[in-house]
């Protein structure tokens, strides 16, 4: 039988290796918030000639109009995305008019979104509240669902630990993506994050439920061996549900979808994979460490982590 729990500290190290680089990038460059959360304007335009001006030329145009923080990116559909501080419809009309005359082309506005700074902060606060409520609901639900198990709240706390792991991986991913590819944390990202949280909890309930069932059957079996046996039993189900269905669909969207959906699909792709990963390699090992009291050895000088 696979001895997954015997290598738990190796998997903890792998998780840290995935999370820490992104957190370092975030500490240096900050979280790439979109206008949804910090306020500002997003203008997407298309040129009739299909010939796009250089981003520097568009930035210069904005500067001439007194907008000094414009950021320009091109998309795979021959359009320009311009992010800037908040501008109203009148200023947007002047920008488009200036583009028409300066670049001698016909410009079509495909999208224009503006969010004031106050509204952006309010949305950010509500998003944080939504994630916090989701985390609290997870603890309450799992504690209630496993109420017949000794120390049922530990199952809920370990699920939250693993869920935080998944969230940190996703945040690390978008932080690095923000620097390399111009990704931003927007409303679509929040949708992906909440989806990851929901799937993550569901997968952990499956693993924990098998541990609960086996604890009634193998009453005299060591808890670590029982948990490892339960993980092996659910491993095929998790892989089949994850890799053979959802991940293939998301991979197709990431490879062939539009630029807006691509970031969403990649975040979901990684996040859902992490949901399965953390159920096996983070949540269950954390429960074993807590149940066995192994964590007390961490604070003893010269003590080595226990291994199976």
UniProtKB/Swiss-Prot annotation:
Calcium among keywords: no
Any one GO cellular component localisation term in the record? plasma membrane
Known function: Part of the Sec protein translocase complex. Interacts with the SecYEG preprotein conducting channel. SecDF uses the proton motive force (PMF) to complete protein translocation after the ATP-dependent function of SecA.
Q: Which superkingdom heads the taxonomic lineage of this protein's source?
A: Bacteria
The beginning of the lineage is:
Bacteria, Bacillati, Chloroflexota, Anaerolineae, Anaerolineales
Protein species of origin: Anaerolinea thermophila (strain DSM 14523 / JCM 11388 / NBRC 100420 / UNI-1)
Q: Which family does it belong to?
A: Belongs to the SecD/SecF family. SecF subfamily.
Supply the name of the protein. Protein translocase subunit SecF
Which compartments does it reside in?
Answer: Cell membrane
Topology in the membrane?
A: Multi-pass membrane protein
Asked if the keyword Metal-binding belongs to this entry, the reply reads no
Q: What would be an example GO MF term here? A: protein-transporting ATPase activity
- Broad class of where this protein is predominantly found: membrane
Which residue windows are transmembrane per the record?
Answer: 10-30, 129-149, 160-180, 181-201, 241-261, 264-284
Entry keywords, A to Z: Cell membrane, Membrane, Protein transport, Translocation, Transmembrane, Transmembrane helix, Transport
Q: For this entry, list what GO says about its biological process.
A: intracellular protein transmembrane transport; protein targeting; protein transport by the Sec complex
InterPro entries assigned: SecD/SecF_arch_bac, SecD/SecF_bac, SecD/SecF_CS, SecD_SecF_C, SecF_bac
User: What interactions and quaternary structure are annotated?
Assistant: Forms a complex with SecD. Part of the essential Sec protein translocation apparatus which comprises SecA, SecYEG and auxiliary proteins SecDF. Other proteins may also be involved.
